[in-house]
Structures are given as C-alpha cells and as structure tokens.
C-alpha cells in the first residue's frame, strides 16, 4: 500500500478505513474489532478514521476495546478523530439542541475523552468536524496549537470546511492545517468545480474524501449507467467496481485520500485494489460524464 505524507510529522496509508459505522456491526466485541483492524493491515490500510460523535459517542470506545485486547496494535496504526459537533446523546445527553462548539474548553475536553475512550496517549490527526458559525478563530487556533505542543495531537486539520473557513482558521495558527476531509465521490462531484479542490491544491494540502462510494448508494441499482461502466473497466483490469470508483478519486492530482465507510470486509479488500488500476484521462472523464449526467461543455 502506498503512503502519503500530510506533513513532515504525519504519513497516512493511501486509503483510510472509516469507523463511523463500526457500532452498527452485530458484533462489536474487542476480538471482532481487532480482526477488522488486522484485515485492514493485511491490505496495507494503517489509518483509522474516527470522530467523537460517531455511534452516539460510542465508536471511539469500541475501537479502544479492540486496541486494549491487542497490545502493540496501536503502534501499527494512525488514528484520525474529530470534534466540534455536540448532539443530545451519550456524554452530551443534556444538550438541548444539536450544535457546534469550537471553543478551547470544548476542544480540550473532547480530546481528553477521545484519548480515554480509545486508550491511547495521543491521536495522530485531529480535525474540527464542521465549520462553526460562532467560531473565534484566534481561540480555536491557539487551542489546536497547544494540543500539538503538548504531544496529545501530532497534526491538525478540518472537515467540511469551505476555502474561506479554512483560510480564516489557518490565519490564526502557527501549525499548518494538513487536510480538509470533504465529501467526494461519483455521486458528489461539486468539489471538482466549486473551488474546494483548486484551493487545496494551491495550498498544497491533500484532502481526505468521506463517503467515496456515496455511502453505498452507488451500488443501490439507481445508477445503472455508472455501475455498468465501473464494472466494464474493472473487468478489463481484473478488479472489482469498488476499486475503480476509488481509483477515480486517486487519479485526481490533488492527491485525494479516500476514507472507506463500510463494515463489509470484502469491500475493504477489493477497495485496496484501486492502487492497481490504471486510469487515463478519457476513462476519468467517461465516469465524470456519467456522474454529472451530461457531456462537459
């Protein structure tokens, strides 16, 4: 598996395993979590993507159970997690309304809870989960810088930020924001033309892509033309349609890092084959044309 450097301190696997659905598994035992991580490692996928809010604030503890059951496993992986969304559930059950909180106090409490739940002394990458209309960039930036200085966080970034949100927070920090995790797939193509990817390329920031398979909708039967093309291309290259859909993102020069959000171990294995796919410009545009439903102008 190829690796990608987001900074001089942080490398991720070229494909990341997203754990937002890990609590949906019928089996969330430490042994099953351990087996899932080891299945990822067998494919070269070493980076696990989390967030405090996943599973109603339970997903990080599920991961922690697996890591506790297998001493040494933590040293083989990178952990990405996120904070900043407060929902009336779990440890925030007293919240009256779902909201965002990017204050220093909330960020620090969230990180401590994440470290405790996952049983680790640091996270490799911390992301602010969504842009906060009430963000005090100076306060948030200082809090993130302090976490990096403390060693509790190796690197910081954001998720779902538009260029102006990214620029504002970066202007208030000494550490570099190393990524922006945004929705990208053959079913979510706006980022290719709305300036998001252009901005990140200008700043030499590699984006992460959540829901790179459209949350599984790509395989629902509703996108027959796109699926037929993916299957044809996959057959030509000896891979599954899943691998072709991931390879479509990898082909972009922005150096997109897809985050797989599946609980299907076989889909994880086939997605790793994306790195074997050769995709020329015309093939990329064939899929893009099917995705947007019309020829480019």
UniProtKB/Swiss-Prot annotation:
Positions bound to D-glucose: 54, 98, 129-130
Active site: 54
Documented EC number(s): 1.1.1.432
Pfam families per UniProt: Aldo_ket_red
Disulphide bond pairs: none
Record field: transmembrane: none
Molecular-function GO term, any one: oxidoreductase activity
Annotated binding of NADP(+), by residue: 20-21, 49, 159-160, 181, 211, 213, 215, 261-263, 267
Alphabetic keyword roster: Carbohydrate metabolism, NADP, Oxidoreductase
Induction, as annotated: Induced during growth on sulfoquinovose.
UniProt-listed PANTHER family: NADH-SPECIFIC METHYLGLYOXAL REDUCTASE-RELATED, OXIDOREDUCTASE YDHF
Protein name per the record: 6-dehydroglucose reductase
């Amino acid at each position: 598996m190829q690796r990608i450097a987001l900074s001089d301190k942080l490398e991720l696997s070229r494909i990341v395993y997203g754990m937002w659905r890990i609590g949906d598994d019928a089996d969330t035992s430490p042994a099953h979590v351990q087996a899932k991580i080891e299945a990822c490692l067998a494919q070269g996928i070493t980076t696990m993507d989390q967030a405090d809010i996943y599973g109603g604030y339970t997903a990080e503890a599920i991961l922690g159970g697996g890591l506790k059951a297998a001493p040494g496993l933590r040293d083989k992986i990178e952990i990405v997690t996120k904070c900043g969304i407060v929902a009336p559930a779990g440890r925030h059950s007293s919240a009256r309304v779902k909201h965002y909180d990017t204050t220093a106090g909330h960020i620090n409490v969230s990180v401590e809870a994440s470290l405790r739940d996952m049983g680790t002394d640091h996270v490799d990458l911390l992301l602010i989960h969504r842009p906060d209309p009430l963000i005090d960039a100076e306060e948030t930036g200082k809090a993130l810088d302090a976490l990096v200085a403390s060693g509790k966080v190796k690197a910081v970034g954001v998720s779902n930020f538009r260029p102006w949100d990214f620029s504002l927070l970066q202007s208030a920090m000494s550490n570099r924001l190393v990524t922006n995790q945004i929705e990208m797939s053959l079913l979510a193509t706006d980022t290719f033309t709305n300036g998001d990817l252009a901005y990140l390329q200008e700043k030499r920031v590699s984006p992460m892509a959540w829901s790179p398979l459209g949350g599984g909708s790509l395989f629902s039967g509703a996108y027959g033309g796109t699926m037929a093309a993916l299957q044809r291309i996959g057959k030509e290259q000896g891979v599954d349609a899943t691998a072709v859909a991931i390879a479509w993102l990898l082909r972009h020069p922005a150096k997109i890092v897809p985050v797989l959000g599946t609980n299907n171990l076989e889909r994880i294995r086939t997605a790793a084959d994306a790195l074997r796919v050769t995709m020329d410009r015309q093939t990329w545009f064939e899929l893009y044309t099917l995705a947007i439903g019309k020829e480019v102008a």
